[in-house]
Amino acid sequence: MTLEKTTRMNYLFDFYQTLLTSKQKSYMSLYYLDDFSLGEIAEEYHVSRQAVYDNIKRTEAMLEQYEEKLLLFKKFQERKKIFEALRKLTDGQPEAESLIDALEKLD
């Protein structure tokens, strides 16, 4: 698994975890956030490794579908770029910096 995919899944999980079942949340959290192996998760839940794999793959697909429709992660990335551009334009002006900070905290 690539670092890029892991990072993307972590963001998608952050944005959409409230739409997942408790089992999906648990498997994804253990796999992506806590770096558990499929075997470790299977042992923890007394299921087969294949069952964990299937659940994670289905959940990944669901997260991608949510993103395709809601675009929360894409919009987050775009806002981040805008904040960075604004910071360059402020040229260290404290008032402008604090306004940008306030906007970022709203995210």
Swiss-Prot record:
InterPro entries: RNA_pol_sigma_r3/r4-like, UPF0122, UPF0122_fam_protein, WH-like_DNA-bd_sf
Range of residues in the leader sequence: none
Pfam families tied to this protein: UPF0122 (PF04297)
S-S bridge residues: none
Family label: Belongs to the UPF0122 family.
Function recorded in the entry: Might take part in the signal recognition particle (SRP) pathway. This is inferred from the conservation of its genetic proximity to ftsY/ffh. May be a regulatory protein.
Protein name, per record: UPF0122 protein BLi01817/BL02321
